[in-house]
A protein has these predicted regions:
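Zn-dependent metallo-beta-lactamase
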Residues: 1-44, 191, 209-210, 217, ...
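Pre-active-site segment of Zn-dependent metallo-hydrolases
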Residues: 20-59, 70-72, 147-153
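Active-site neighborhood of phospho(di)ester-bond hydrolases with catalytic His/Asp-centered motifs
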Residues: 24-25, 55-68, 83-85, 141-146, ...
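Active-site environment of divalent metal-dependent phosphoester hydrolases
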Residues: 31, 63-68, 89-91, 107-110, ...
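Metal-dependent catalytic neighborhoods of phosphoester/phosphodiester hydrolases
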Residues: 70-77, 205-211
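Metallo-beta-lactamase
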Residues: 84-137, 233-251
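Active-site-proximal loop/helix segments of hydrolase catalytic cores
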Residues: 122-188
Length: 265
């Protein structure tokens, strides 16, 4: 068995903990718009994608449309279990999903062998969620805006999914703090891999708001922060990354030979 992560562009991920498939914040089809309309902010995908079915669990960090995208969520069966922030769960309920769990900060939810812990995330403006995924196949921390809950204890993780640059607006300041948070994430979790999120996928943006955005940081600056032994993965939309693989036991390898090795992959 193994731990895999497939980047879907923007904030979207498919996390595979062995055979358990967890979809996070998918934007797969159609445009992305923020009120009051396209003139203010509009995003278009370079390539639309089908829903990566089957999905065992849908996890939503925020209720905003770039995390809780109506047209993309409509591609999923309404019986798909949903875990999310209170704002995200309210959106999912309005879209017809029926098996819903809203997690407050610090609350936990178990789905099969996966334990999901909600952490305080980005204030947009209500405080949304980050998540700690804990499964026998691996452990991941994910927060899409570069915010780290100070109450999360130090613990070794297999991977951290985070932006690595800051994005902001004049007067408002940074609302994505990837560059600022990366050293804290590395110190807190000592991850074996950091997967770049949020700002990837070659999405095309336009509108009045987009023209005001500023960016600070780079992949090169992020790589310089990471300690030896920690991989920086410049995530590409559609790519599936192997983060951890359990080796078969000596007894199993000798009994099963090549077959056991194939099953592990």
């Amino acid at each position: 068995m193994a731990l895999h992560a497939t980047y879907l562009g923007a904030n979207g991920w498919l996390l595979e903990f062995g055979e358990l498939r967890v979809l996070v914040d998918p934007w797969l089809t159609g445009p992305l718009e923020f009120p009051p309309g396209a003139w203010f902010f509009r995003g278009e995908l370079p390539q639309e994608r089908p829903a990566p079915l089957p999905v065992d669990l849908l996890v939503l960090t925020q209720g905003l449309p770039d995390h809780c995208h109506p047209a993309s969520l409509a591609l999923l069966p309404p019986t798909t279990p949903v875990v999310g922030s209170p704002a995200a769960v309210a959106r999912a309920r309005a879209l017809g999903f029926s098996e819903l769990t809203a997690l407050a900060h610090g609350a936990r939810h178990c789905h099969e062998q996966l334990q999901l812990t909600a952490s305080a995330g980005a204030p947009v403006p209500q405080l949304e969620n980050g998540y700690l995924f804990d499964h026998p196949e691996g452990r991941i921390y994910l927060e899409p805006h570069g915010f780290l809950d100070p109450t999360l204890p130090e613990q070794p993780l297999d991977a951290v999914i985070t932006p690595v640059v800051d994005l902001g607006l004049p007067v408002v300041g940074a609302f994505v703090k990837g560059q600022q948070v990366l050293p804290q994430l590395v110190q807190r979790f000592k991850p074996l891999a950091v997967l770049v999120s949020t700002t990837g996928g070659e999405v095309r943006f336009e509108g009045a708001l987009n023209r005001l955005l500023w960016l600070k940081g780079s992949l090169e600056a992020a790589a310089a922060v990471l300690p030896e032994g920690c991989r920086l993965i410049d995530s590409r939309a559609g790519e599936r990354y192997l983060l951890k693989q359990h080796q078969p036991s000596t007894a199993g390898a000798s009994a099963g030979g090549a077959k056991a090795g194939t099953a592990a992959g």
